[in-house]
């Protein structure tokens, strides 16, 4: 009896296995999937066994950065998630935002925008770290900017208006506080006694990271740099949702002007440069509609949720006021200029070139040279005079004075504040 039952069971098991093979597909992960094609084949007397193929995709292996840095960040961060900056809670009135579930959900919705900024910020950190290690007195200013910009282009994997340099690299020296980058033929050499502001911009999908630092090679300038760095950090500390811009400016000035610096045996109070300021950043637009003053007396406008700001401060041993001086190098297409008729054919052609290559991002003459433009100065000046392109000449305090700058980009998340460009250096 036992033997007969075993034989019947074995036959039954065999029949079930055959039935399974004829009518189903056994997947690699052990799941069984009904196969209509096999059933149709069975009705026609054609029974086929089908098996799902394994995916042949290989996991990407992250590359390591080279020295000098040349590997694009997408090859290092293969999961496309880039490092988060310094995260700070808001002040007490807004501390509830940190744990509010609705605000956290809103924050998650904006991940792509934040990730673009974080990618740009990581490019900035790596580019400036390399720059600080190789820039030395005796280099030409042209070599300085080429070192920074070539590194930036490689790391951000420059791709037209999708990713690239956010604005011309500023390397303003001594009494010149901002908007100097060398034009073709500039033979200026970086000297041991120079104070150089290094202002670097990186963008990804138009999301701009704007961050700056100051380099000096003589310790007598250390207190000037310390004053400006402390003032910038105070501005970052005071910034936040509902923070009033005028109150931020007052706090910055108080810290800045508490410092003194002795240069060549003469003591100077460090002054906030009152006609320079920080600003909000819009997509593809370096200066949005809001300005963050660095002295008291600004507008009583509030910062708002979701805004992105460049908090930057400038200190000077001079008058604390800048004026336009020297040859212009920086330009940008005005976003809301509208259609303005141009009579000069060369100006029309140059405008098309600017629109295709830079959009509303700032550019400089070197960038026009780089893409093959020549004999364009008359046309460029025509675009400026027509109100289509804005020129940004160098901004200088009195000669013989020294100026310094530090700057960070911050994101006002619904939940917290992120200093996205923060690094170990500043």
Curated annotation (Swiss-Prot):
Substrate binds at residues 179, 287. It is found in: Cytoplasm. Pfam families: Peptidase_M24. GO terms for cellular component: cytoplasm; cytosol. Binds 2 divalent metal cations per subunit. Has a high-affinity and a low affinity metal-binding site. The true nature of the physiological cofactor is under debate. The enzyme is active with cobalt, zinc, manganese or divalent iron ions. Most likely, methionine aminopeptidases function as mononuclear Fe(2+)-metalloproteases under physiological conditions, and the catalytically relevant metal-binding site has been assigned to the histidine-containing high-affinity site. The keyword Metal-binding applies. Its main location: cytoplasm. Its EC number is 3.4.11.18. Residues 47-60 have a biased composition (Basic residues). A divalent metal cation 2 binds at residues 210, 279, 312, 407. Keywords: Aminopeptidase, Cytoplasm, Hydrolase, Metal-binding, Protease. Residues 10-34 have a biased composition (Basic and acidic residues). GO terms for biological process: protein processing. It catalyses: Release of N-terminal amino acids, preferentially methionine, from peptides and arylamides. Residues 1-72 are annotated as: Disordered. A divalent metal cation 1 binds at residues 199, 210, 407. InterPro entries: Creatinase/aminopeptidase-like, Met_Aminopeptidase_Type2, Pept_M24, Pept_M24_MAP, Pept_M24A_MAP2, Pept_M24A_MAP2_BS, WH-like_DNA-bd_sf, WH_DNA-bd_sf. Its cofactor is Co(2+); Zn(2+); Mn(2+); Fe(2+). It is an enzyme of class 3 (hydrolase). One of its GO terms (molecular function) is metalloaminopeptidase activity. SUPFAM superfamilies: Creatinase/aminopeptidase, Winged helix' DNA-binding domain. Cotranslationally removes the N-terminal methionine from nascent proteins. The N-terminal methionine is often cleaved when the second residue in the primary sequence is small and uncharged (Met-Ala-, Cys, Gly, Pro, Ser, Thr, or Val). NCBIfam families: met_pdase_II. Belongs to the peptidase M24A family. Methionine aminopeptidase eukaryotic type 2 subfamily. PANTHER family: METHIONINE AMINOPEPTIDASE 2. This is Methionine aminopeptidase 2. It comes from Schizosaccharomyces pombe (strain 972 / ATCC 24843).
